[in-house]
Amino acid sequence: MFVESGYHATAMDEIADRAQVSKPVLYQHFPGKLDLYLALLDLHTAKLPVLVTTALESTTDNAQRVAATVDAFFEFVERKDAAFRMVFESDLINEPAVAERVERMMGLCADSVSVVVKEDTGLPQEQAHLIGMAMVGMCQVVARYWLSKGTSIPREEASRLVATLGWRGLGGLPLHEDGTGEHPGA
């Protein structure tokens, strides 16, 4: 219901009716509407980092890793439960507890990407994390844009285009040559 109507327009009475429980039973489990919302948000924000990590671990070929990571975001926004709307388009994004969860989720996704970037380039962690955040930010924004425009470009094609863009950037980073993890010029 939060996905359909937003936080402010959703009443606990409606939630109890939809869940086929009494309102007192609902309040036994969740002291308030925000607590319920945060529990659902925790459930949804746990999904994307798993998709990203799985994508990165699916191959050792970096171009394929980029493609799989990009597609993980397209998969997340295309899910039937529309959980991405609660995560990225919440009317509560200015609520500190909500913002912290979304930032943590994006940080976990960026961390996963940065591990690969750091291993392959030897860049310092802060730089690798910045690149990871750039990658996941691009994926998140483009996947949401693609879905909002009615998916006239098939998912596979849209994902491929974005992966090509991402790989052209990431593939241009110099690999460390001596196996020490030191980036040339660092």
Question: Where are the regions a protein language model picked out?
Answer:
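Short coil/turn segments at alpha/beta junctions that flank glycine-rich nucleotide-binding fingerprints
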Residues: E4-H8, T59, K80
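Amphipathic alpha-helical packing segments from all-alpha helical-bundle domains
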Residues: A46-P49, P96-T121, H129-A134, V141, ...
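Short secondary-structure transition hinges
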Residues: A68, E75-S114, G122-L123, S148, ...
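Amphipathic C-terminal alpha-helical segment
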Residues: E75-R79, A83, D111, V115, ...
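Helix-turn-helix
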Residues: M1-D35, A39
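Generic hydrophobic, amphipathic alpha-helix propensity
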Residues: I15, L40-L48, V52
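Hydrophobic alpha-helical connector segments
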Residues: A39, T53-R79, G132-M135
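Solvent-exposed, amphipathic alpha-helical segments
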Residues: M1-E4, K47-S58, M138-K149
